[in-house]
Amino acid sequence: TETTEGDFIAEGGGVR
């Protein structure tokens, strides 16, 4: 699950 920059990625458990 990729979101916009700075958003929290629930499935990834981090930020992109």
From Swiss-Prot:
One of its GO terms (cellular component) is extracellular region. Its main location: secreted. Conversion of fibrinogen to fibrin is triggered by thrombin, which cleaves fibrinopeptides A and B from alpha and beta chains, and thus exposes the N-terminal polymerization sites responsible for the formation of the soft clot. The soft clot is converted into the hard clot by factor XIIIA which catalyzes the epsilon-(gamma-glutamyl)lysine cross-linking between gamma chains (stronger) and between alpha chains (weaker) of different monomers. One of its GO terms (biological process) is blood coagulation. It is found in: Secreted. Disulfide bonds: none annotated. Keywords: Adaptive immunity, Blood coagulation, Coiled coil, Disulfide bond, Hemostasis, Immunity, Innate immunity, Secreted. It comes from the Eukaryota. A long coiled coil structure formed by 3 polypeptide chains connects the central nodule to the C-terminal domains (distal nodules). The long C-terminal ends of the alpha chains fold back, contributing a fourth strand to the coiled coil structure. Cleaved by the protease thrombin to yield monomers which, together with fibrinogen beta (FGB) and fibrinogen gamma (FGG), polymerize to form an insoluble fibrin matrix. Fibrin has a major function in hemostasis as one of the primary components of blood clots. In addition, functions during the early stages of wound repair to stabilize the lesion and guide cell migration during re-epithelialization. Was originally thought to be essential for platelet aggregation, based on in vitro studies using anticoagulated blood. Heterohexamer; disulfide linked. Contains 2 sets of 3 non-identical chains (alpha, beta and gamma). The 2 heterotrimers are in head to head conformation with the N-termini in a small central domain. This is Fibrinogen alpha chain.
